[in-house]
Structures are given as structure tokens and as C-alpha cells.
């Protein structure tokens, strides 16, 4: 009996799409690291990205991607056949993990919409998202809160990372090091699902 799970990791928005490259690179590094044991019993990961910006998707190393228009209201998403395209993309998955940086219009609106469609087609879904830094402004914070509130009702597991917490812990570190820490936490969460004993 093959109980290895097919896990689709779906990056949403600009950060989510970029994060797919970072997670894949870390997975490859772990596979080459003698201290990290990967074997044939590990779950299988496939990576995808959805965004409204073509440049982000062009630079992504994912297996497949989906470019949507900037119109993200329910009617527009229906016109773009989002549910049908998700079915084609991840319909065979045992679990979908959504990755997004909340605060901007795309991720804050689209991530809950995707989770809603995945729930409609009965695909177990979890998500890891992070809230914006304080300097990104009140509007970004409001967008993130609304998006996260909606998302929490649609996924089985939701991990919310606080960028401000990362900043507080990262005293005397460069901006690049802070962003790398955020990326690392996202990757660690996703790759924690690699062992086959995980049950969706």
C-alpha cells in the first residue's frame, strides 16, 4: 500500500510566488545535506504559483503557474474559471499548502478565494501567511486582518507569522537577514509536512 501523500504547495501573490523558489532551494539543499535524511518514504511535493503579475511568475521555478487579471471580485474570478483551473492544477492532491504574504490586495483577496474554491472541491488545505511589517502602514494591516479572518474559516490549519516579531528579535541584523529569517520560517513550516506519517 502506498501511503505517500501528494502535497501541492501553492504560492499566492508576489511573495508567495517568490517563496516557491526559496522553498524548493531549501528542499534541494536538505536533500544534499547528510544531516537531513530524506528517503523514498517522504511525501511528494509539487510547487505552483498564482499571481496577477506576469514577471513574478516568469521568474518562478514552479511546475505550473496561473496568471490572473487584477480584477479579483467574485464575478471576475468566476469569469476566469478559477475553480476549474484549480481543479486541473491541484485536483489530485492529498493536501494543498497555501503560502502568502498578507497586506497587499492580491494575496489578501485571492488567498481566501482560493481556499474557498479548494474547500468546495473537497481538497484539504492548510496555509502559512505572514502579516506585514509595521512600516507598511495601517491599510496593509487592515487588509491582512480581513484576509486572515476569512482564511481561518476555510482551512484546516493556519499558521500566521508576525513580521514585527521577527524584526523585534533580529536586533543588529540587516534588512536582508530579517527577510531571510521570515523565508526560513515559511520554508520550515512547509517542509514539516515531508514525513509520510503526516495525515491530511
Residue ranges and their predicted role:
Residues 1-200:
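Tubulin/FtsZ superfamily GTPase core signature
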Amino acid at each position: 500500500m502506498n501511503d505517500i501523500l501528494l502535497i501541492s504547495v501553492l504560492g499566492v501573490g508576489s511573495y508567495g510566488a517568490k517563496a516557491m523558489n526559496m522553498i524548493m532551494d531549501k528542499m534541494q539543499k536538505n536533500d544534499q545535506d547528510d544531516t537531513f535524511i530524506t528517503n523514498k518514504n517522504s511525501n511528494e511535493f509539487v510547487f505552483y504559483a498564482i499571481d496577477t503579475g506576469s514577471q513574478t511568475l516568469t521568474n518562478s521555478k514552479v511546475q505550473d503557474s496561473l496568471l490572473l487579471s487584477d480584477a479579483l471580485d467574485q464575478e471576475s474570478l468566476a469569469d476566469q474559471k478559477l475553480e476549474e483551473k484549480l481543479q486541473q492544477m491541484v485536483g489530485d492532491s492529498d493536501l494543498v499548502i497555501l503560502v502568502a504574504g498578507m497586506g497587499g490586495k492580491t494575496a489578501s483577496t485571492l488567498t481566501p478565494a482560493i481556499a474557498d474554491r479548494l474547500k468546495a472541491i473537497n481538497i484539504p488545505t492548510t496555509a502559512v501567511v505572514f502579516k506585514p511589517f509595521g512600516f507598511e502602514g495601517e491599510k496593509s494591516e487592515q487588509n491582512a486582518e480581513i484576509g486572515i479572518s476569512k482564511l481561518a474559516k476555510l482551512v484546516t490549519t493556519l499558521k500566521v507569522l508576525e513580521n514585527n516579531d521577527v524584526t523585534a528579535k533580529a536586533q543588529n541584523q540587516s534588512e536582508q537577514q530579517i527577510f531571510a529569517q521570515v523565508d526560513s520560517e515559511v520554508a520550515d513550516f512547509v517542509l514539516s509536512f515531508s514525513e509520510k506519517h503526516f495525515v491530511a
